[in-house]
Swiss-Prot record:
Quaternary structure annotation from Swiss-Prot or TrEMBL: Part of a complex with ERBB2 and EGFR. Interacts with clathrin trimers. Interacts with SBF2/MTMR13.
Role summary: Generates phosphatidylinositol 3-phosphate (PtdIns3P) and phosphatidylinositol 3,4-bisphosphate (PtdIns(3,4)P2) that act as second messengers. Has a role in several intracellular trafficking events. Functions in insulin signaling and secretion. Required for translocation of the glucose transporter SLC2A4/GLUT4 to the plasma membrane and glucose uptake in response to insulin-mediated RHOQ activation.
Gene giving rise to this polypeptide: PIK3C2A
Official protein name in the record: Phosphatidylinositol 4-phosphate 3-kinase C2 domain-containing subunit alpha
UniProt source species: Homo sapiens (Human)
Family that this chain belongs to: Belongs to the PI3/PI4-kinase family.
Tissue: Expressed in columnar and transitional epithelia, mononuclear cells, smooth muscle cells, and endothelial cells lining capillaries and small venules (at protein level). Ubiquitously expressed, with highest levels in heart, placenta and ovary, and lowest levels in the kidney. Detected at low levels in islets of Langerhans from type 2 diabetes mellitus individuals.
């Protein structure tokens, strides 16, 4: 039916139809008799042929082509050849009515013409229905031909299933003749809807069971037009044959969308001129029964069997549309093709219908037989299962190495750990020993040696013991140390050393170790089933159609049909039938085919017919034709309602099959005998038709006026061409709303140029309705089009066949509505799924992408040294760049040109592949040859090849091969990136999937983490189907025990999520009650099960400690969940469970910090970072590990009032409270310095914002850490139009106070700066790694990481192109900027105001006073008889301050005791008394402001008197006040009170009074030389000395001597009021050669800048440069002396 151009390259197949021979004349009666005999003979012949073929397809293309070349001869040949000649010249349009009626009986009128397309090729379910009918609105893949009696022809070798535009550049020849055939063409469907739909990835597709023949019509188009014209003559009208208006309307509708069910067009109505043969119909609505009639037979029809109806008017029927700017009209003639549908009606509806017709042809399958097809897997799923089954056999349950049944403790490599001179105390519990065995060992000792030491206590002769059969289990956890690793490399041991806790282990044999997660023999024998174990997994996306729900809907439908056919009043029953149909369509994603729409309309019209007319209408099926139908095994309908229901039933079954088959491979369905053509030889352009979007919500209709699609074609994450925009259309309404485009999209690219991994992206946009007032967006009139959703489709399937046929693509979209059911997302959006129908061409051959033959010959590697210096330098500069992200087009072209010079720089492979100009088939052979000869990459380098920039399957497969060298522990750390990389895999069964599943089979920790990551990824609707398959494979191969454990964890998370939701929704006062009641249900879960913790599977909980469970008062109201450890030697398990917040970003930030910490540890830098675990267990919910003994900075600061954030001492004094001894405090301060340095670097590099004192925490051991990473990558929280985070990172004065040990800078601050700069430079060396890790997380849907642009912050923060010295200077300036930022303190203050909540005394577990760790009462300490302020002392700690000695005499004591309190501590006592007793009259506190200095003797003397008076008044106050716990705690002696050295200290203790002229101190310098320039970096100076003891204002001045003119003078900035300044400034001397510098000396002087007097000298040093090796950097401390200076 299509017009085909001459440029296709396919051979023409001219018609071989012979001229009919002339026979003798016969009269009409004899002719009719001959016709009847011929029909009977043809029926018999075709029945025999069908039985022989069994509806099987032909075995070869050659055989099929021969069949196509046969002509379907006329049944009879009449001798009127002369009349035929004359008929050639007859102009039908000019004949009178009488001549037309006379011509009707002239059998010679139908002359020999080019035959109409008689048959179609063997089709898959995705064929285009346009081959059989031509609707007046285009719905296929190709534009229609020009109107008029065009001849549509197809060559036998290329039986195209779609029509095409005459002038389209597709390579087809419109002059090719047709290929008639006597062979029936078999369809895989019982009927064709005018358009039909498929889902993208049906989990349970249908398989067509029967095949149906289509015969060549024996009446030409011209004859059909003639007969139609005769039917409108006056004589015909007189005989009562004029059609009613309804019939005419139905005819037009039929021409627009002719159903394949409508093959039974009236055969004899137009021929019967007897007015008595049929009743006269006047102004009565009568159905066109011949359009509704379902004929079930393979017999040949009347010669006029396939007459085509003509469109009544060009205006109504010749619909035009534009394609590429040109108006095209649809062909005016349509035909039924005599498509004899075997419509078996189900027994419920018509019980007397047989399942097969007399010819043995399969009927329409029953509901049961058809729905059995739903449960059949498609071929890609089956291939994946086979692959997983093969993988599973490589890991038998008998292999203990890959199936230990328990978890291994993770390890982290540390530099020089084997040589580390550190010892630890280890306690090992051994069976049979009451007490543990305790001994000291080196952390560098292997676990196997530790086991041998422990066995020495048990066995006298170790030679008789198999040491390898023993393991060391961690007490309190179900994990085992790895015998072949050092003890100190295990993370558990590192944490014990970090927290200074006891290392407790348990010695067990393998047999005694709990192995309840091991796979068994039964697991190995169980077949792989991807869907069997997913029933308990929460699936956020709507599942694909399955058998049972659809079966129920079909049963309901047939029940309604049976009822409608039995009762007298059919109107209400038919309404129920239509409702049942609507439910079926709704279950199929709201897809309603046009066949269903038209069938429903006809059913409504049929039920409205008067009963007096029913018999008349029924008679149309009676008489001679009735007996004929019965002999063919077809149902003879009794009334129009039954006919319409039959047609509706067939349309429903069509939709079921089409819905199930969509998305399957062209070779999935049916043993296709299509020929195969290689893609690289195919010159046709890529094209497809966007037909419609189904399932549109009513909210869209009101909110959006028009819709359009942006179609883009991408590869390697980039568009191959400029995206194409569809036309803008509105919505239509039948059962449901739909958007209809029916538009042909053509990409200007030949199929031969498409890479294998090409992906089609369709993005739906909506134009807001300007007049609608219901939109929630008040500013919508000013907004542009909204992106509503996006869907992607690979152009080649997993077998590398080009996609074809109709596809249903699931497009998920967010909408501003709460009324539509769907998946609720964050910020009030609702996820809606609509179905996008796209029609691809279905050619007669399958187009397959074949991999080019790789040249295995050795590539000639070029020597880089042979290049010219400038070219070599340019190439090296490119190779040394941190990432391919910064390469320009010129750089990429240059690098690709010089790629053969780069073999000795293997790490540059990602840059080279990213620079490839294209990935066309013709260029792949050379690229693959280069790839296979490239040296192997390190796993972390090869990780970049899994990014979206590298879609090629060969590249990704090789990358996985290199990554296989990664250890299990490293893989566990990087698992989130690998899970996201699955999105970039083009097919399900990829090397990456195989790699992850193989590692999961061998390591329980990997399997556990992979499960939770995959489960969380199910919420990504665009990839949820793929993740379901991988998750199903993981559960299938992991074994029953592991699967049951994971499902228990899932159940626990669901229960906790329900509790958290209830508590969150409850009012503040009722929350505790709700919590306690809800936790009882969780406790009942633990009564049946022990459960491993999702955060850490080595922790096993056996019950809840409900009394200890509580909730936090933040906005999300997270729960504090306390569980009892199943291991009696373990501690309680405390976690936080949170709902309402997306924890995935927190997971990513903590993952990056953990990787940073491991990088530092590998380089020997232990910054004592606090790494806690966080796990997202679902959408906006998750679990977080609680760090014990820690508080927020806000909670610490507000103990000193709401302005505590502006004070310097709160942190230091809080640490002193928990670390009272000097040794403990020094250790805590050191922990603070190291951990604070790590936090500063990590938060800056990651751009972590929204930092305030409620998300920075401090542990009592001094470790500082950050929580709550809702803002990162530089996306700062805004305060109006200003950023709340004004400083590069948080470093406040109270932190500096702890670092310095006081208010003034000390050498400890220099240590802090050095730690920061060292850590920063180590991370800078791994810039590419962090960019790759973050880049792989872009598709995860994190709100702050959506594109490559978000990575720009990290790249800029790491300064990859700078030297280490320059980076050190840069970060030093950041430290100075952060330390001097008043904005941070103000931010803290604002947060204190917002969060401060005082409600009486703190809870029992909180200290009542900031300087006392516990609360005490007079019952414990005894009542106080006398109290007074005895004296005061001056102390230094390290700053000068006064402490007041309080004399206390208690009842029963003879000797008084003394406690020492500061003025601030007295003030804290009074403030908290005021809070506890707001209605009591308390004594006045002496808090008047003191002008000038406060820490002087005069002020202390006055305060002593005032404080003594205050205490006397307090003790004489009411008993409730004087004897409260707060007062008792204040007077309770602390450790500092009991230390003798704390009673008094010399006034000048710690002070330094130098003798006149004394010089002291040292300077730290970095000296290097490169590119003709000498670099002097002045880093630190320590221990400077001044004559008067005052703090100087030091700066550094240098000269290169000799220098008579002082031209070499360089100076640093001035550092104010410090003896230990940090400069980190670079002094540069350019233009000096090494020979010149060897003759020079560097003179360095340190001076103090004074404003009121002359600068004075603090010390200096002279360094001869000849003593330095200028080829490398020298970093060293130099002692300052009293040298002369310029």
């Amino acid at each position: 039916m299509a017009q085909i151009s001459s440029n296709s390259g396919f051979k023409e197949c001219p018609s071989s139809h012979p001229e009919p021979t002339r026979a003798k004349d016969v009269d009409k009666e004899e002719a009719l008799q001959m016709e009847a005999e011929a029909l009977a003979k043809l029926q018999k012949d075709r029945q025999v042929t069908d039985n022989q073929r069994g509806f099987e397809l032909s075995s070869s293309t050659r055989k099929k082509a021969q069949v196509y070349n046969k002509q379907d001869y006329d049944l009879m040949v009449f001798p009127e050849s002369d009349s035929q000649k004359r008929a050639l010249d007859i102009d039908v349009e000019k004949l009178t009515q009488a001549e037309l009626e006379k011509l009707l009986l002239d059998d010679s009128f139908e002359t020999k013409k080019t035959p109409v397309l008689p048959v179609t090729p063997i089709l898959s379910p995705s064929f285009s229905a346009q081959l059989y009918f031509r609707p007046t609105i285009q719905r296929g893949q190709w534009p229609p031909g020009l109107p008029g009696p065009s001849t549509y022809a197809l060559p036998s070798i290329y039986p195209s299933t779609y029509s095409k535009q005459a002038a389209f550049q597709n390579g087809f020849n419109p002059r090719m003749p047709t290929f008639p055939s006597t062979e029936p063409i078999y369809l895989s469907l019982p009927g064709q809807s005018p358009y039909f739909s498929y889902p993208l990835t049906p989990a349970t597709p249908f398989h067509p069971q029967g095949s149906l023949p289509i015969y060549r019509p024996v009446v030409s188009t011209d004859m059909a037009k003639l007969f139609d014209k005769i039917a409108s003559t006056s004589e015909f009208l007189k005989n009562g044959k004029a059609r009613t208006d309804l019939e005419i309307t139905d005819s037009k509708v039929s021409n627009l969308q002719v159903s394949p069910k409508s093959e039974d067009i009236s055969k004899f109505d137009w021929l019967d001129l007897d007015p008595l043969s049929k009743p006269k119909v006047d102004n009565v609505e009568v159905l066109d029964h011949e359009e509704e009639k379902n004929v079930s037979s393979l017999l040949a029809k009347d010669p006029w069997d396939a007459v085509l109806l003509e469109e009544r008017s060009t205006a109504n029927c010749h619909l035009e549309r534009k394609v590429n700017g040109k108006s095209l009209s649809v062909a005016t003639v349509t035909r039924s093709q005599s498509l004899n549908i075997r419509t078996t009606q189900l027994a419920k509806a018509q019980g007397h219908i047989s399942q097969k017709d007399p010819n043995g042809t399969s009927s329409l399958p029953t509901g049961s037989s058809l729905l059995q097809e739903v449960e059949v897997q498609n071929e890609e799923m089956a291939a994946f299962c086979r692959s997983i089954t093969k993988l599973k056999t490589k890991f038998p349950y008998t292999n203990h190495r890959t199936n230990p049944g328990y978890l291994l403790s993770p390890v982290t490599a540390q530099r020089n750990i084997c040589g580390e001179n550190a010892s630890v105390k280890v306690s090992i519990d051994i069976e049979g020993f009451q007490l543990p065995v305790t001994f000291t060992c080196d952390v560098s000792s292997t676990v196997e040696i530790i086991i041998m030491q422990a066995l020495c206590w048990v066995h006298d002769d170790l030679n008789q013991v198999d040491v390898g059969s023993y393991v060391l289990k961690v007490c309190g956890q179900e994990e085992v140390l790895q015998n072949n690793h050092c003890l100190g490399s295990h993370e558990h041991i590192q944490n014990c050393r970090k927290w200074d806790t006891e290392i407790r282990l348990q010695l067990l044999t393998f047999s005694a170790m709990c192995q309840n997660l091991a796979r068994t023999a039964e697991d190995d024998e169980t077949p792989v089933d991807l869907n069997k174990h997913l029933y308990q997994i929460e699936k956020p996306c709507k599942e694909a159609m399955t058998r049972h729900p659809v079966e129920e809907l079909l049963d309901s439908y047939h029940n309604q049909v049976e009822l409608a056919l039995q009762i007298e009043n059919q109107h209400r029953a038919v309404d129920q039938v239509i409702k049942a149909v609507r439910k079926i369509c709704s279950a199929l994603d709201g897809v309603e085919t046009l066949a269903i729409t038209e069938s429903v309309k006809k059913l409504k019209r049929a039920v409205n017919l008067p009963r007096s007319k029913t018999a008349d209408v029924t008679s149309l099926f009676g008489g001679e034709d009735t007996s004929r139908s019965s002999t063919r095994g077809s149902l003879n309908p009794e009334n129009p309602v039954q006919v319409s229901i039959n047609q509706l039933t067939a349309a429903i079954y069509d939709l079921l099959r089409l819905h199930a088959n969509s998305g399957r491979s062209p070779t999935d369905c049916a043993q296709s005998s299509k020929s195969v053509k290689e893609a690289w030889t195919t010159t046709e352009q890529l094209q497809f038709t966007i037909f419609a979007a189904h399932g549109i919500s009513s909210n869209w209709v009101s909110n959006y006026e028009k819709y359009y699609l942006i179609c883009s074609l991408s590869h390697n994450g980039k568009d191959l061409f400029k995206p194409i925009q569809s036309k803008k259309v509105g919505t239509y309404k039948n059962f449901f709303y739909l958007i209809k485009w029916d538009e042909l999209i053509i990409f200007p690219i030949q199929i031969s140029q498409l890479p294998l991994e090409s992906v089609l992206h369709l993005t739906l946009f909506g134009i807001l309705n300007q007049s609608s007032g219901s939109s929630p967006d008040s500013n919508k009139q000013r907004k542009g089009p909204e992106a509503l959703g996006k869907v992607s489709l690979p152009l080649f399937d997993f077998k590398r066949f080009l996609t074809c046929g109709t596809k249903l693509l699931y497009l998920w979209t967010s909408s501003h509505t709460n009324s539509v059911p769907g998946t609720v997302t964050k910020k009030g959006y609702v996820m809606e799924r609509i179905v996008l129908q796209v029609d691809f061409p279905s050619p007669a051959f399958d187009i397959i992408y074949t991999t080019p033959q790789v040249d295995r010959s050795i590539i000639q590697q070029h020597n880089l040294e042979t290049l010219e210096n400038d070219i070599k330098g340019k190439l090296l500069d490119i190779l040394h760049k941190d990432s391919s992200l910064g390469l320009s087009k010129e750089d990429k072209a240059f690098l690709w040109e010089k790629r053969y010079y780069c073999f000795k720089h293997p790490n540059c492979l990602p840059k080279i592949l990213a620079s490839a100009p294209n990935w066309k088939w013709v260029n792949l052979a050379k690229t693959y040859s280069l790839l296979h000869q490239w040296p192997a990459l390190y796993p972390l380098i090869a990780l970049e090849l899994l990014d979206s920039k590298f879609a090629d399957q060969e590249v990704r497969s090789l990358a996985v091969t290199w990554i296989e060298a990664i250890s299990d522990d490293e893989l566990t750390d990087l698992l989130p990136q690998f899970v996201q990389a699955l999105k970039y895999e083009i097919y399900l069964n990829s090397s990456l999937v195989q790699f992850l599943l193989s590692r999961a089979l061998g390591n329980i920790q990997i399997a556990h983490n992979l499960y939770w990551l995959l489960k969380d990824a199910l919420h990504d609707v665009q990839f949820s189907t793929r993740y379901e398959h991988v998750l199903g494979a993981l559960l299938s191969v992991g074994g029953k025990r592991l699967r049951e454990e994971l499902l228990k964890q899932t159940k626990l998370v669901q229960l906790l999520g329900g509790v958290a939701e209830k508590v969150r929704q409850a009012s503040g006062s009722a929350r505790q009650v709700v919590l306690q009641r809800s936790m009882e249900r969780v406790q009942s879960f633990f009564q049946k099960n022990k459960c491993r913790l999702p955060l850490k599977p080595s922790l096993v909980a056996k019950e809840l400690n409900i009394k200890s469970c509580s909730f936090f008062s933040s906005n999300a109201v997270p729960l504090k969940v306390t569980m009892v450890n199943a291991d009696p030697m373990g501690e309680e398990i405390n976690v936080m469970f949170k709902v309402g917040e997306d924890l995935r970003q927190d997971m990513l930030a903590l993952q990056m910090i953990k990787i940073m910490d491991k990088i530092w540890l590998k380089e020997g830098l232990d910054l004592r970072m606090v790494i806690f675990k966080c796990l997202s267990t679902g959408r906006d919910r998750g679990m977080v590990e609680l760090v014990p003994a820690s508080d927020t900075l806000r909670k610490i600061q507000v103990e000193y009032g709401v302005t505590g954030s502006f004070k310097d001492k709160p942190l230091a004094e809080w640490l002193r409270k928990y670390n009272p001894s000097e040794e403990e405090y020094e250790k805590a301060s050191e922990n603070f310095i190291y951990s604070c340095a790590g936090c500063c670097v990590a938060t800056y590099v990651l751009g972590i914002c929204d930092r305030h004192n409620d998300n920075i925490m401090l542990r009592s051991t001094g470790h500082m850490f950050h929580i709550d990473f809702g803002k990162f990558l530089g996306h700062a929280q805004m305060f109006g139009s200003f950023k709340r985070d004004r400083a590069p990172f948080v470093l406040t004065s109270d932190m500096a106070y702890v670092i310095n040990g006081g208010e003034k800078p000390t050498i400890r601050f220099q240590l802090f700066v050095d730690l920061c700069c060292q850590a920063y430079n180590l991370i800078r060396k791994q810039t590419n790694l962090f960019l790759n890790l973050l880049s792989l997380m872009i598709p995860s849907g994190l709100p702050e990481l959506t594109s490559i642009q978000d990575l720009k912050y990290v790249r800029d923060a790491l300064q990859p192109q700078t030297t280490d010295a320059e980076a050190t200077i840069f970060f030093t300036r950041l430290i100075e900027s952060s330390l001097g930022s008043i904005a941070t303190k103000f931010n803290f203050f604002i947060h204190n105001l917002a969060q401060l909540r005082f409600s009486g005394l703190p809870s029992n577990d909180e200290p009542i006073l900031s300087f006392s760790p516990k609360t005490y009462s007079f019952r414990q300490d005894g009542r106080i008889k006398e109290v007074s302020v005895f004296t005061y002392h001056k102390k230094y700690n390290p700053d000068k301050h006064y402490i007041y000695v309080v004399r206390i005499l208690r009842e029963g004591q003879i000797e008084p005791s003394f406690v020492f309190r500061t003025f601030d501590e007295f003030q804290e006592l009074h403030n908290k008394l005021s809070i506890i007793f707001p209605l009591w009259k308390l004594p006045g506190f002496p808090n008047r402001m003191v002008l000038g200095r406060t820490h002087i003797k005069d002020v202390a003397a006055k305060r002593k008197i005032e404080l003594n008076s205050y205490l006397q008044s307090l003790m004489n106050a009411s008993t409730d006040v004087a004897e409260c716990d707060l007062v008792c705690t204040f007077f309770h002696p602390l450790l500092r009170d009991e230390k003798a050295e704390g009673i008094a200290r010399s006034a000048d203790a710690g002070s330094f009074s130098p003798t006149p002229g004394q010089i002291g101190g040292a300077v730290k310098l970095s000296i290097s030389y490169r590119n003709g320039t000498l670099f002097i970096m002045v880093m630190h100076i320590k221990d400077l000395v001044t004559e008067d003891g005052a703090d100087p204002n030091p700066y550094v001045k240098t000269y290169l001597l000799p220098d008579n003119h002082k031209t070499s003078k360089r100076k640093t900035k001035i550092s104010r009021k410090t003896r230990n300044p940090t400069f980190n400034e670079m002094l540069v001397y350019s233009g000096y050669s090494k020979e010149t510098l060897r003759q020079r000396e560097l003179q360095l002087s340190v001076l103090s800048a004074e404003s009121l007097r002359e600068n004075f000298f603090l010390g200096g040093v002279t360094l001869p440069l000849k003593d330095f090796n200028l080829s490398k950097e020298t970093v060293k401390w130099y002692q300052l002396t009293a040298a002369t200076y310029l």
